[in-house]
């Protein structure tokens, strides 16, 4: 497993505004989209390409195109949906799948309550979108789910991570071909497993509290 924290003034600035508790939901959504596009630029550096011959208005030349099958983008519901537009703006030809995961309140296990993915992910580069890597449980189960479908190259784009969650993920995934791309690794998890200083509940701040 590899981890990259994107060091860029625009990333730092947009993340600072996201953290501010006074930032309203419409601004939060817009900044999330912009921040994900910046992170995705780095996350796609190793996307698979092949040479293609094209005709310009002047002459024939050799350019670059994605190999087939094209990348698959998988937001984890619901907060990951707020990251999707920022990713597909950069990679509009990518296919999109979905994973819905939640913690069972009785067993505390992560359960998959919804999925819309190809049955066979062999040979696909998969980009998972999940804003907060706190304990790492949800992301771990999402990656395992994708591996069971045949994926072998998974990149996860997150806004924030806690050191504890990253360590747990690395312990369980080991040498698996997983790349984590982040805007920041924060200080710690608190007693409620919230990232500190964090930015609060990303889903609530993106969409408001439904209940």
Curated annotation (Swiss-Prot):
Entry annotated with the keyword Metal-binding: no
Enzyme class, spelled out? transferase
Q: Which reaction does it catalyse?
A: UMP + diphosphate = 5-phospho-alpha-D-ribose 1-diphosphate + uracil
Question: Which residues take part in binding uracil?
Answer: 195, 200-202
What are the recorded Gene Ontology BP terms?
Answer: UMP salvage; uracil salvage
Which cofactors is this protein said to need? Mg(2+)
Enzyme Commission (EC) number: 2.4.2.9
Q: How is its activity regulated?
A: Allosterically activated by GTP.
Q: Which GO terms describe its molecular function?
A: GTP binding; magnesium ion binding; uracil phosphoribosyltransferase activity
Concerning its family, UniProt says: Belongs to the UPRTase family.
- SUPFAM superfamilies the UniProt entry points to: PRTase-like
User: What does this protein do, in the record's words?
Assistant: Catalyzes the conversion of uracil and 5-phospho-alpha-D-ribose 1-diphosphate (PRPP) to UMP and diphosphate.
Note how many cofactor molecules are bound and how. Answer: Binds 1 Mg(2+) ion per subunit. The magnesium is bound as Mg-PRPP.
Domain of life of the source:
Bacteria
Which HAMAP family does this chain map to? Upp_B
Designated name of the protein: Uracil phosphoribosyltransferase
């Amino acid at each position: 497993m590899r981890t990259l924290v994107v060091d860029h003034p625009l990333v730092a600035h947009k993340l600072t505004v996201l953290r501010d508790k006074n930032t309203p939901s419409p601004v939060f959504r817009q900044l999330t989209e912009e921040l994900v596009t910046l992170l995705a630029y780095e996350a796609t550096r190793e996307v698979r390409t092949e040479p293609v011959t094209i005709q310009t208005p002047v002459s024939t030349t050799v350019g670059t195109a994605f190999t087939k099958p094209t990348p698959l983008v998988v937001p984890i519901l619901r907060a990951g949906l707020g990251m999707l537009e920022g990713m597909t703006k950069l990679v509009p030809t990518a296919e999109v799948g979905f994973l819905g995961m939640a913690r069972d309140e009785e067993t505390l296990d992560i359960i998959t309550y919804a999925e819309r993915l190809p049955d066979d992910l062999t040979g696909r580069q998969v980009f998972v979108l999940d804003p907060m890597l706190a304990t790492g449980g949800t992301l771990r189960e999402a990656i395992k789910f994708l591996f069971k479908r045949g994926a072998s190259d998974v990149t996860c784009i997150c806004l924030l991570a806690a050191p504890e969650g990253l360590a747990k993920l690395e312990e369980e995934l080991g040498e698996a071909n997983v790349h984590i791309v982040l805007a920041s690794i924060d200080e710690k998890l608190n007693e409620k497993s919230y990232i500190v200083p964090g930015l609060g509940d990303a889903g609530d701040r993106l969409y408001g509290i439904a209940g």
